[in-house]
UniProtKB/Swiss-Prot annotation:
Pfam families: PseudoU_synth_1 (PF01416). Formation of pseudouridine at positions 38, 39 and 40 in the anticodon stem and loop of transfer RNAs. This is tRNA pseudouridine synthase A. InterPro entries: PsdUridine_synth_cat_dom_sf (IPR020103), PsdUridine_synth_TruA (IPR001406), PsdUridine_synth_TruA_a/b_dom (IPR020097), PsdUridine_synth_TruA_C (IPR020095), TruA/RsuA/RluB/E/F_N (IPR020094). The lineage of its organism: Bacteria, Pseudomonadati, Pseudomonadota, Gammaproteobacteria, Vibrionales. Homodimer. SUPFAM superfamilies: Pseudouridine synthase (SSF55120). GO terms for biological process: tRNA pseudouridine synthesis. Keywords: Isomerase, tRNA processing. It comes from Vibrio vulnificus (strain YJ016). It catalyses: uridine(38/39/40) in tRNA = pseudouridine(38/39/40) in tRNA.
Length: 264
């Protein structure tokens, strides 16, 4: 049978999601925990392979097993064997045609900036910090130039292995919540470092170095060297993954923490 799981994790101490030799990864820790519950080796497939230091509240995985367990056994059993910075949020039996990556129709990320003169103490590894003034309204205005089907070469990592730079941006909203500026981005898929590269350029708009229209020019230029720097990993969260309704996967609050699903 095939089981889907919702996963939450703090990526600070991991070299990304994907299993690697000799370094800690979220995938490795999860597979070890599930293997103990299943009493056989388990290999998971995920919706999105996050980079080193990136977090997740809405990661989705699936795995196959011939062992019969109640869903609560998978959630409670895995959590009992996982480190404190990784947790299973839900479990559900799914049909064999479900695939955590290939069945997904959209992914959603949030990038959180603590916008204050002084750095944070609590949550220091869960947010990015920018000390100067940021105009979130201009950042939001700039982001609207990226909506729709576009060539995101200007916001694509040089080492990106995707065959196409085209992605469909569904929404990009920038809002302020006290000292926190949140960039909420949803697309059908993302090229490597796309969210962090967009964020780096939006920050340049927010601090007045560039006008909002500059983002439109960057998009049309199709040149990564012209865009802003890649934003730090610690502020980024994979918060949600969309699937066809037929799979009826559980829905949890996407967060992180107190942030509501709808920030508008």
């Amino acid at each position: 049978m095939r089981i889907a799981l919702g996963i939450e994790y703090n990526g600070t101490d991991y070299f990304g999601w994907q299993r690697q030799r000799e370094v800690a990864s979220v995938q490795e820790k999860l597979e070890k925990a599930l293997s103990k519950v299943a009493n056989h080796p388990v290999e998971v497939q995920c919706a999105g392979r996050t980079d080193a230091g990136v977090h997740g509240t809405g990661q989705v995985v699936h795995f196959d097993t011939n062992v019969e367990r109640k869903m609560v056994a998978w959630t409670m059993g895995a959590n009992a064997n996982l480190p404190k910075d990784i947790a299973v949020r839900w479990a559900k039996a799914v049909p064999d045609e479900f695939h955590a990556r290939f069945s997904a129709t959209a992914r959603r990320y949030r990038y959180i900036i603590f916008n204050h003169a002084l750095r944070p103490g609590i949550l220091g590894s869960g947010v990015s910090h920018y000390h100067g003034e940021l105009d979130e309204k201009k950042m939001h205005e700039a982001g609207q130039y990226l909506l729709g089907e576009n060539d995101f070469t200007s916001f694509r990592a040089v080492q990106c292995q995707s065959l196409s730079p085209f992605r469909n941006m569904i929404h990009l909203n920038v809002t302020r919540h006290g000292h926190y500026v949140v960039i909420d981005i949803k697309a059908n898929a993302f090229v490597h470092h796309m969210v962090r590269n967009i964020t780096g350029s939006l920050i340049m708009v927010g601090r007045g170095e560039q006008d909002p229209e500059w983002i439109k020019w960057l998009l049309e230029a199709k040149d990564r060297k012209l865009a802003g720097p890649t934003a730090k990993a610690e502020g980024l969260y994979l918060v949600d993954v969309d699937y066809p309704e037929e799979f009826d996967l559980p829905r949890e609050s996407i967060g992180p923490l107190f942030l509501p699903d709808n920030l508008n």
